[in-house]
Amino acid sequence: MRFLTLNTHSWCEIHQIAKIRTLAKFIIDQQVDVIALQEVNQLTSTPVVKEPLNYRGGAGVPVHEDNYALLLVQALNEMGATYEWTLTETHIGWDRYDECVAILSRLPIRGIKPIDMSPEYGYHQVQRRAAQAALIETETGTFWCATTHMSWWDFDGEPLFAQEYARLSQALADCALTAPVLLGGDFNSAAHLSDEGYALVTSSGMVDTRSLAEHTDGENTVHREIAGWEGSTDAKRIDFVFADRLLTVNSHAVVFRDNSPEAISDHSGLLLEIDPSSWAPQSLLTPLTTQH
């Protein structure tokens, strides 16, 4: 099974439609089964779509005609591929977008779980974050695919990442009672920092799939200065795919490298090939206590 995660930076990119089509062609050419997306934007002012193509739900806001995930699903459909999709809103971005996370799957989606990681913040506050999990059916069983876009470790003196991950870990631990969990996303926390977000996630028992991979291609996912990392020009690994238990990871590759002509976002993507029949029977995830 092939899995892709990407922070799309949608509608903040030039040539956005062309980049959507590039991604759709890649998904088909690489036979990607499940895709976790972040920064899936739509303008709040554009027309609502009454019956979005292949949409399975998950959002508290309506889908608009310029929704990035909808346009991607439509492009895939035009190319002959059918993908179901889900959506969960996080907050208002740049004063004009519904910023969301989404999951696309060519395998059946059997359940959807929106995860509010910031109940103390309102929808118009950038501090509000949400994740989503979708129960995916494979030939050998089901697993939960989750997508998230975390806050920075320190947000104006507030430990937002730790608070968010505590709630996320609790929700994913509930998911893990019924099926394995695969979590992809933009964690806004560099892997080399030993006392920040990456360390917190792995301390809960989540396994970095790159460490399990038989073959790896690339490591860092951001190679230049981006929004939220102003003044930081060093290459860093801030996008990850974690699993709640051991499994066979055949390959783990950085794709659409952000510092290459193939870039379609200000983040690189991660493409994994895993064996969905290889999940260990026991989850390693121990949920964390909510920080105050």
Regions found by a protein language model. Name each.
Residues R2-L4, V49-L53, M79-G80:
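A short alpha-helix capping/helix-coil boundary motif
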Residues M1-V34, T82-H292:
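Active-site regions of metal-assisted phosphoester/phosphodiester hydrolases
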Residues Q16, V40-A75, G93-D98, A191-V201:
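Metal-dependent catalytic neighborhoods of phosphoester/phosphodiester hydrolases
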Residues L37:
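A short beta-strand submotif of the Rossmann-like class I SAM-dependent methyltransferase core
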Residues I27, Y68, L72-G80, L172:
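Hydrophobic, Leu/Ile/Phe/Ala-enriched alpha-helical segments that form helix-helix packing faces
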